[in-house]
A protein has these predicted regions:
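Residue-level signature of outer-membrane beta-barrel architecture
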Residues: 18-20, 89-91, 102, 121, ...
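Outer-membrane beta-barrel transmembrane strands
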Residues: 76-94, 101-104, 117, 191-206
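Glycine-rich, phosphate-binding/catalytic loops in enzymes
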Residues: 10-14, 47-48, 115-116
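Surface-exposed loop/interface segments of Gram-negative outer-membrane beta-barrel transport/assembly proteins
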Residues: 22-67, 108-109, 118-205
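A beta-strand signature from Gram-negative outer-membrane beta-barrel systems
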Residues: 1-29, 80-82, 95, 101-106
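Short, glycine-/polar-rich solvent-exposed loops and beta-turns at beta-strand/coil boundaries
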Residues: 6-10, 76, 112-115, 150
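Conserved short hydrophobic patches within well-ordered secondary structure
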Residues: 12-16, 98, 119-121, 204-206
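C-terminal beta-signal and adjacent terminal beta-strands/loops
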Residues: 72-74
C-alpha cells in the first residue's frame, strides 16, 4: 500500500481486488461454513425455588405454580451458516465470473438475526486485437433483518420465575393474551410474549 499511496498510506489502506474469470472451460467452486454463538455469562437471578423460599407473599397468590428460567426462554444458540458459490470461465475473447454469497445469521435472542444474499457478475471483453479491454461489473444485495426486542432481556431478569410462559387452553385469559401468561401490572410484560409477538424488522436491497 505504501508503494502505491506513499505517506497517505500511514493511516492504513484497504485494497480491494475484483476477481475476473479465468480463460478456458467453466469452473465452479463452493465453500461454506457454520458457526454458533452462545452467551458466556448471564446475570444471576432468583430461580423459582429461591423465589418461593424468600417471598413473604408466596401464599397470597405470588406463586403461579410453574418453574421458568426466563433467560433461557428468550435466548438461543446463535447459529450462522454461510455459502459461497462462483462460476468462471471464458467464451472466445469474453471472460466471465459470477459469484453468489448467502448468509443466514441467527442471534442469541429469539426472533433476532438476518438473511442476506449477495450477487456479483464480472465480464471482460477483449477488442481491437487485444489492445482494448472492456470490463463490466454488476453487484446486488438483498437483506432481511429481524432486530428482536432487547427489552425482553430486561423483563427476563425481572419476571416471576413461578409464572408459566403460556396459559392452559382452558384458562379464561388464554384468548385475551394470545395464549401467553400475563400479569396485569404496569411495565411488567411476559418476556417471551414480547419477543415472539413483537414485529421489529427491516430490509434493504441494492
Amino acid at each position: 500500500a505504501a508503494a502505491i499511496y506513499g505517506s497517505r498510506a500511514s493511516a492504513g489502506v484497504i485494497l480491494i481486488t475484483t476477481k475476473k474469470g479465468r480463460g478456458g472451460k467453466a469452473t465452479v467452486s463452493y465453500n461454506g461454513y457454520v458457526t454458533s454463538e452462545v452467551i458466556d455469562r448471564t446475570v444471576q437471578v432468583t430461580d423459582a425455588a429461591e423465589f418461593r423460599s424468600l417471598n413473604p407473599n408466596i401464599n397470597n397468590g405470588d406463586d403461579k405454580g410453574a418453574t421458568t428460567n426466563w433467560l433461557d426462554e428468550v435466548t438461543q444458540p446463535g447459529l450462522t451458516h454461510v455459502h459461497n458459490v462462483s462460476l468462471s470461465g471464458s467464451i472466445g475473447r469474453t471472460s466471465y465470473r459470477a459469484a453468489f454469497n448467502y448468509r443466514d445469521a441467527g442471534g442469541v435472542l429469539i426472533n433476532n438475526g438476518f438473511k442476506q444474499l449477495n450477487g456479483r457478475l464480472n465480464l471482460s471483453q477483449k477488442a481491437l486485437n487485444d489492445k482494448l479491454t472492456i470490463d463490466l461489473n454488476i453487484s446486488a444485495t438483498d437483506r432481511n433483518s429481524q432486530f428482536g426486542f432487547t427489552e425482553a432481556l430486561r423483563y427476563a431478569m425481572l419476571y416471576n420465575p413461578t409464572a408459566p410462559v403460556r396459559l392452559e387452553d382452558s384458562d379464561p385469559n388464554a384468548e385475551t393474551w394470545g395464549g401467553y401468561y400475563q400479569a396485569v401490572n404496569f411495565d411488567y410484560f411476559n418476556p417471551v410474549a414480547i419477543a415472539e409477538q413483537g414485529i421489529n424488522e427491516g430490509s434493504f436491497n441494492t
